[in-house]
């Protein structure tokens, strides 16, 4: 693998960063280095891999990477897998940040450090250990990648990205408590675990949207939102279901889809106990209990619980009937009425009585039939 210093600067790189390791004595010439603790796929006696020279790396929204952690990306949104390429090749738009991401993904997730640091005496080496296999004194997971703002002016877009990357986001495990949120917004008091998340949140108050789509001009506060939007233009769908093969452009949509297969319904109503697979469905359901009707018709003032019902209602005023039967040509305002009509042609009767087994094409017919059993 080529050293990061050998990678040419990408035109899209907005802000130079440097790599450093905490707790390391000052190196000669103050060159920032990242020691990988021998976690490369090599022999125990191989020399430790050191990345040197502060190349201009574009790590996008990366705040911190700790060697040995289960998750390399602290951001809540997972990064899509890159298509495999031949060794030594590099995409034209992939800067040194892409090389670093590939490097980190190649490391074992829970490997323990056993890098050797030059010759040592037999007295310093534990019994039974071969030369070059003396364990590193630094605890596993304590090394980090630190983003440091550089004074030198970068290419176009650098001031925008520098605001997001221009802070030391790295931290060692010993340096902060698990679950701590030390970065607080002065405007609303909300706290965040990482300073980059605070910077992104503050754009809600300032209205700043530094990431602009070159296709349609739409702007975004965060880099991840911009990347997800860009897939609308490219058609990229990196998240594929292993059970049915359906692909999605957003990880959140993929997660919601998986609940169809596993039957998971994590969102439960506190009033009636009904559970839902999506939080939005729970919010809409709770309006049945609260009586809230946030969607009002601008023509007649009638209000509705759901926006879909409002859209269907507005077709009364416009006369629009978008659902047309291909068999008889009859058109309908709503989809539910359209599907109910189709059953008159297909003969489908999906509503069956639990008492006698008689089936009906419409739910209203089933309800009317069940009154016979109630009288009995």
From Swiss-Prot:
User: What Pfam families does the database record attribute to this sequence?
Assistant: zf-C2H2 (PF00096)
The yes or no answer to whether the keyword Nucleotide-binding is present is no
Q: What family does this belong to?
A: Belongs to the krueppel C2H2-type zinc-finger protein family.
Organism (species): Homo sapiens (Human)
Q: Know the name of this protein?
A: Zinc finger protein GLI4
Where do Polar residues bias regions lie? Answer: 43-55
Q: Which UniProt keywords apply?
A: DNA-binding, Metal-binding, Nucleus, Phosphoprotein, Repeat, Zinc, Zinc-finger
Q: Which SMART domains match?
A: ZnF_C2H2
Where is the protein found, in the record's own terms?
Answer: Nucleus
As stated in the Swiss-Prot or TrEMBL entry, residues carrying the post-translational modification Phosphoserine are 86
GO BP: regulation of DNA-templated transcription
The reply on keyword Phosphoprotein is yes
Q: Where are the zinc fingers (C2H2-type)?
A: 183-205, 211-233, 239-261, 267-289, 295-317, 323-345, 351-373
Q: Where is this region: Disordered?
A: 1-97, 113-135
Residue ranges, compositional bias (Low complexity): 10-27
């Amino acid at each position: 693998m080529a050293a990061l210093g050998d990678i040419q600067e990408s035109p899209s790189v907005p802000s130079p960063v440097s790599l450093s390791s905490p707790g390391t004595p000052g190196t000669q010439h103050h060159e920032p280095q990242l020691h990988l603790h021998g976690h490369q796929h090599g022999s125990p006696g191989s020399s430790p891999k050191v990345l040197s020279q502060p190349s201009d790396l574009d790590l996008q929204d990366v705040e911190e990477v700790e060697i040995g952690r289960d998750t390399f990306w602290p951001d809540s949104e997972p990064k899509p897998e890159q298509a495999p390429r031949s060794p030594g090749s590099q995409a034209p738009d992939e800067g040194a940040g892409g090389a670093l991401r590939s490097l980190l993904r190649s490391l074992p997730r829970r490997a323990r450090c056993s890098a050797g640091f030059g010759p040592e005496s037999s007295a310093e080496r534990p019994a039974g250990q071969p030369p070059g296999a003396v364990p590193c004194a630094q605890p596993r997971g304590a090394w980090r990648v630190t983003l440091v703002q550089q004074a030198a002016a970068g290419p176009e877009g650098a001031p925008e990205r520098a605001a997001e990357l221009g802070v030391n986001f790295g931290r060692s495990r010993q340096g902060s408590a698990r679950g701590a949120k030390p970065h607080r917004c002065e405007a609303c008091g909300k706290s965040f675990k990482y300073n980059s998340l605070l910077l992104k949140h503050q754009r809600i108050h300032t209205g700043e949207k530094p990431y602009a789509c070159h296709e349609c001009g739409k702007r975004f506060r965060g880099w991840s939102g911009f990347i997800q939007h860009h897939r609308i233009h490219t058609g990229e769908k990196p998240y594929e279901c292993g059970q049915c093969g359906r692909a999605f452009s957003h990880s959140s949509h993929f997660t919601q889809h998986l609940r169809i297969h596993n039957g998971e319904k994590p969102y439960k109503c506190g009033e009636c106990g009904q559970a839902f697979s999506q939080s939005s469905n729970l919010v809409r359901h709770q309006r049945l209990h609260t009586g809230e009707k946030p969607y009002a018709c601008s023509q007649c003032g009638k209000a509705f619980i759901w926006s879909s019902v409002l859209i269907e209602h507005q077709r009364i005023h416009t006369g629009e009937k978008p659902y047309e039967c291909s068999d008889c040509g009859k058109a309908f305002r709503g989809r539910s009425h359209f599907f109910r009509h189709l059953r008159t042609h297909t003969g489908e009767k999906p509503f069956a009585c639990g008492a006698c087994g008689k089936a009906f094409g419409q739910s209203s017919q089933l309800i009317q039939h069940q009154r016979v059993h109630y009288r009995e």
